[in-house]
A protein has these predicted regions:
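Structural helix-boundary/capping segments
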Residues: 50, 61-64, 72-75, 80, ...
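Tryptophan-centric aromatic hotspots in well-structured domains and transmembrane helices
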Residues: 47, 71, 100, 115-118
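Acidic-enriched catalytic cores of C-N bond-cleaving enzymes acting on peptides and small amides
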Residues: 1-5
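Hydrophobic alpha-helical segments in the ANL/AMP-binding
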Residues: 113-125
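Short, active-site-adjacent cap segments at secondary-structure transitions
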Residues: 7-8, 91-94
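Short, surface-exposed loop/helix-turn segments at secondary-structure junctions
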Residues: 14, 62, 94-116
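Short helix-loop capping/hinge segments that flank enzyme active sites or metal/cofactor-binding pockets
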Residues: 16-75, 91, 131-150
Length: 189
């Protein structure tokens, strides 16, 4: 089916709650490092801690309420469907020298999480998810020396349906994916 649950707000919810977790787990380390933090902490770690420190209790409350509403929309979706299938990430594998993808198809990413929204948005739902290899896509930008690169298919099930998810993933994994090639027009760049 061409239907998909409404994940509106998922990106902001994810970023807010992730930042709070970074502050809770690494805020003390961030403070102790003082002037050395730029040299010793990855910029994305600093970004999360600093984001958390700019948030208000109202911001966190909105994120928690938003997550509850989003999870309810997804629960209702799963009353009609068994699984969601979507690309694991929005881009093909990129050079290891890049920390993260800064632009997709001419659209700038505002932070290091946006290039993987198809994963982070699903994380907010609280649903079990798995990524399975699902063939290869040709790359014509010279970055991969003309070799095809692997693509993943993300499968998502309703909470409590982990067995179904694993059964479908196992069936797909044993289905000769190594010989499949994805059509270029179905893979976001």
């Amino acid at each position: 089916a061409d239907e998909f649950p409404d994940l509106g707000g998922a990106s902001d919810i994810f970023q807010t709650l992730r930042a709070v977790l970074f502050e809770a787990n690494l805020g003390e380390v961030y403070d102790r490092l003082g002037d050395r933090r730029d040299a010793l902490l990855k910029d994305t770690v600093r970004w999360n801690v600093e984001l958390a420190r700019r948030l208000t209790a109202a911001d966190v409350g909105r994120a928690l309420r938003g997550r509850g509403a989003l999870q309810e929309r997804v629960r209702l979706f799963f009353e009609r469907f068994d699984l969601i299938a979507l690309p694991t990430v929005q881009v093909l594998p990129f050079p290891v020298e890049l920390d993260w993808v800064h632009e997709i198809d001419g659209v700038p990413m505002s932070n290091y999480l946006e290039w993987m929204r198809s994963c982070t948005d699903i994380s907010v739902t609280g649903c079990p998810a798995i990524s399975v290899p699902f063939g290869f896509a040709p790359v014509d930008d010279g970055a991969a020396d003309g070799a095809d690169v692997p693509v993943g298919l993300q499968l998502v099930a309703a909470p409590g349906h982990e067995l179904l998810l694993l059964q479908v993933a196992h069936a797909l994994d044993g289905d000769g994916w190594l010989t499949r090639r994805a059509p270029v027009d179905t893979v976001a760049r």
